[in-house]
């Protein structure tokens, strides 16, 4: 067990850091400091916390309501325990929290390939499905990409192809200590939103989808504190990405500040569709959808992928004084060219071939 340490506050000195003091702070409805949150996660990631303490922490934090400082402390701890990817931070991630239970096709995964094919390097961080039929890792496997690669292999993929995938269990092995308590309590907690904040490549830009309406501004706040350029989004139909069935809420993170607005896809020439037109299936079904998309199939799925790819491109480039709609319109043209030129299909084939070779040589 780590030795307890005292925490100074404006009102005096808090009790030494122990689980009773941290849990007592939360159950009293008071916020943790960045360092206190980091201490708690360090204990969890070091296997120094019991299942009861982990479960109590997740539930108490959820009931109080998480702050950007708390999420930042937890995420910083996770990154401190993670395996590092040796790439510079001039990359973008396109990722969602999951948990929207919509069972749509893998929009963010397809968008990641489109963005990478446009020449912007992508490091995607993801996992297998938790509440859906197909997660990002599942569909990439079905597309022929080997996902169990280590840091050096992922970095090589980024250098040679322009995209890499960090499979969460490989890069955050210590998170397994929280697995059983999370499963036992059976409700979403802060652990469900940490994935998009803990990409081991530490990208400077991102399109981050958040399925939980009460946490979207908190996630945006963490990214602002880090100085990232990002769009943090939630479809007003509940999707953890930009939707084409209705409007989306968009938190624009730039220069350490957050601005919030609504986006209607019709304002950039994308028709609204029924959410049913974006539904998918298991990994094999969704992989077939991706292959048809990259072969030139048009329709609602293409529109949704282009919209999210455009948003990631806008987050990477920055708005630069443009309106969100203007930045997205520029990104749409770039994304469409990635598909129509065959670049996205070619990139996928090259990536699958490279990862197969790397996996064989491990």
Curated annotation (Swiss-Prot):
Binds 2 magnesium ions per monomer. Anthranilate 2 binds at residue 182. It catalyses: N-(5-phospho-beta-D-ribosyl)anthranilate + diphosphate = 5-phospho-alpha-D-ribose 1-diphosphate + anthranilate. It comes from the Bacteria. It is an enzyme of class 2 (transferase). One of its GO terms (biological process) is L-tryptophan biosynthetic process. Mg(2+) 1 binds at residues 108, 241. Anthranilate 1 binds at residues 96, 127. Belongs to the anthranilate phosphoribosyltransferase family. This is Anthranilate phosphoribosyltransferase. It comes from Rhodococcus jostii (strain RHA1). The gene is trpD.
């Amino acid at each position: 067990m780590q030795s307890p340490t005292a925490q100074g506050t404006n009102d005096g000195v808090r009790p030494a850091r122990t689980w009773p003091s941290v849990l007592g702070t939360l159950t009293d409805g008071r916020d943790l400091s960045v360092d206190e949150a980091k201490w708690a996660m360090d204990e969890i990631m070091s296997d120094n916390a019991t299942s009861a303490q982990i479960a109590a922490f997740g539930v108490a934090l959820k009931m109080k309501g998480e702050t950007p400082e708390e999420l930042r402390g937890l995420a910083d701890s996770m990154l401190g325990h993670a395996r590092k990817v040796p790439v510079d931070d001039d990359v973008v991630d396109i990722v969602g929290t999951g948990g929207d239970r919509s069972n749509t096709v893998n929009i963010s995964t397809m968008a990641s390939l489109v963005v990478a094919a446009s020449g912007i390097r992508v490091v995607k961080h993801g996992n297998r499905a938790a509440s859906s039929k197909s997660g990002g890792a599942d569909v990439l496997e079905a597309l022929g990409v080997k996902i169990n690669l280590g840091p050096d292999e992922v970095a090589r993929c980024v250098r040679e192809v322009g995209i890499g995938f960090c499979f969460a269990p490989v890069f955050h092995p210590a998170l397994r200590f929280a697995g059983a308590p999370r499963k036992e309590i059976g409700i979403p907690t802060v652990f469900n939103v940490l994935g998009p904040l803990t990409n081991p490549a530490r990208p400077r830009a991102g399109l981050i989808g958040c399925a939980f309406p009460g946490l979207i501004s908190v996630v945006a706040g963490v990214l602002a504190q880090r100085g990232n350029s990002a769009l943090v989004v939630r479809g007003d139909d509940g999707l953890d990405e930009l939707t084409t069935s209705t409007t989306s809420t968009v938190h624009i993170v730039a220069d350490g500040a957050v601005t919030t607005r609504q986006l209607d896809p019709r304002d950039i020439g994308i028709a609204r569709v029924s959410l049913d037109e974006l539904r998918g299936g298991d990994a094999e079904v969704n992989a077939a959808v991706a292959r048809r998309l990259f072969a030139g199939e048009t329709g609602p799925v293409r529109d949704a992928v282009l919209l999210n790819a455009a948003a990631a491109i806008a987050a990477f480039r920055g708005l630069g004084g443009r309106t969100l709609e203007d930045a997205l319109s520029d990104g749409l043209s770039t994304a469409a060219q990635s598909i129509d030129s065959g670049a996205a299909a070619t990139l996928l084939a090259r990536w699958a071939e490279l990862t197969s070779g790397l996996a064989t040589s491990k």
